């Protein structure tokens, strides 16, 4: 199980999800949520992930159930909002996971919103461990900047001198 969690973190980082500033626990939960959205169970291969094109979309509570059942968590079903706000926030911002995949126009607090792996990211994820992995990661980044680079970008703001009397 730990090996798959480590691989999930490698994949997320390669796809531009920043993880270095997260606690180890937050990184592990993000990896488990990511694998749950992908429909992975221990022992499965990355080639077996499911994405939005497969119509595999999970609600927050379904993600919790999957994490509890297959990834050794003990998360209350009442913690569904934490999944969205904490565990899936960065992968969603990085466009690795699509939120509201079931209904793109759903409100943020709509209980019917489903999460799914972005098909563009799924093409890359399925190549993890193969010879074409690095090339597919590079192709993925040609189409979009990484979230990590976007968040770390230096802002050049015009500054106005202020004098306090």
Question: Predicted segment positions?
Answer:
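Long, low-complexity, charged/polar intrinsically disordered regions in eukaryotic proteins
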Residues: 1-43
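Intrinsic-disorder-associated interaction segments
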Residues: 1-5, 26, 56, 126-130, ...
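Generic alpha-helical structural element
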Residues: 19-22, 52, 80
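Short amphipathic alpha-helical interaction segments
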Residues: 28-29, 56-61, 74-100
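Mixed-charge, low-complexity interaction segments
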Residues: 39-47, 51, 85-123
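Short acidic, hydrophobic short linear motifs in intrinsically disordered regions
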Residues: 44-76
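A short, highly charged nucleic-acid-interacting micro-segment common to nuclease
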Residues: 77, 163-165
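Short, amphipathic alpha-helical interaction segments positioned at domain boundaries
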Residues: 101, 106-163
């Amino acid at each position: 199980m730990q090996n798959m969690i480590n691989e999930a973190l490698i994949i997320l980082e390669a796809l531009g999800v920043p993880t270095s500033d997260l606690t180890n626990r937050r990184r592990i939960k993000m990896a488990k949520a990511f694998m749950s959205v992908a429909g992975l169970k221990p022992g499965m291969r990355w080639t077996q992930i499911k994405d939005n094109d497969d119509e595999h979309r999970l609600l927050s509570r379904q993600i919790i159930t999957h994490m509890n059942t297959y990834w050794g968590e003990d998360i209350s079903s009442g913690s569904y909002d934490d999944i969205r706000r904490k565990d899936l926030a960065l992968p969603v911002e990085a466009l690795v996971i699509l939120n509201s995949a079931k209904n793109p126009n759903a409100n943020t607090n709509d209980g019917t919103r489903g999460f799914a792996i972005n098909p563009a990211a799924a093409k890359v994820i399925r190549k993890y461990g193969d010879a074409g992995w690095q090339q597919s990661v590079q192709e993925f980044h040609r189409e979009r900047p990484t979230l990590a680079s976007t968040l770390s970008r230096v802002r050049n703001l015009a500054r106005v001198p202020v004098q306090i009397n």
